[in-house]
Amino acid sequence: MNIVLLGPPGSGKGTQAKMIAEKFNVKHISTGDILREHVRNGTELGKEAKKYMDAGQLVPDSILIGIIKDRLSKPDVAGGYMLDGYPRTIPQAEALDKILPELKQKIDVVLNIDVPDEELVRRLSGRRMCKCGRSYHIIFNPPKVPGKCDECGGELYHRDDDKEEAILNRLKVYKQQTQPLIDYYTKAGLIANINGAGEINQIFDEISKVLSKFQ
C-alpha cells in the first residue's frame, strides 16, 4: 500500500505518520529527511541540492524527483510507503506520476488531514519557547509554573511566527499551494479527506478505516 499524506501546519500530520507507519508497516518517507541525507552523504543529487540550499533557494523539482525516485527504488519500500512532504504542487505530482510506472508502483490513496483554521491557530499559537531549546504549549503541554521553563527556570517567549497573523499567513500560503493538488488527486479518485479536528486516537481510527480497505 502506497500513501501520500497531506495536511497543513498544526494538523498533527507528523504524529499520525508515525502511527500509520507502525500499524500498517509502511515506510515513512519524509522529503526533508531524505534531502538532508543526500546532502550529508555528498551524493551527486545532494551536491546539486546543496548549491540551492546554501543560496537560500528552493531545490528545483528536477532534483527533488531524482531524490524521490532513488528512495522509491530501495528494496525496503517493497511492503509499501507513505510520502510526507512530496508532492506539494501539481508539477511535482505529475513528475511522480511519470516515474511510478517505471518503478512498477502506484499511489493507492492520498490522505488529506483537514482541520478548520481556528483550530489550527489555537494549536499553533499556544506554543511557547525557552532560550534553552525546550518548547511548551499553553494548552497541551503547559509548564509547571506559567511563563517559566521547567528545565532552567528561564522566561518563556512567544515566537513571532507562532503569532496569529503569521499563522494565518502560513495557512493561506499552504492552501494556495495545496488546493490545486487536492483537486488533482480528487479527479484521480485517490483523495480521502480526514477530519483532523478531534483527538489523536479518534483521527487515527478514521485513517485506519480508510487504509484497511487497501490491505
UniProtKB/Swiss-Prot annotation:
> What InterPro entries does UniProt report for this protein, alphabetically?
Adenyl_kin_sub, Adenylat/UMP-CMP_kin, Adenylat_kinase_CS, Adenylate_kinase_lid-dom, P-loop_NTPase
Q: Where is this region: NMP?
A: 30-59
Tell me where on the tree of life, at the top rank, the source sits: Archaea
- Show the coiled coil region(s): none
Query: Where does it localize?
Result: Cytoplasm
Give a yes or no for keyword ATP-binding in this entry.
yes
Q: Which GO terms describe its molecular function?
A: adenylate kinase activity; ATP binding; zinc ion binding
The UniProt entry's sequence similarity note says:
Belongs to the adenylate kinase family.
Complex formation? Monomer.
The identity of this protein, by name, is Adenylate kinase
Organism of this sequence? Methanothrix thermoacetophila (strain DSM 6194 / JCM 14653 / NBRC 101360 / PT)
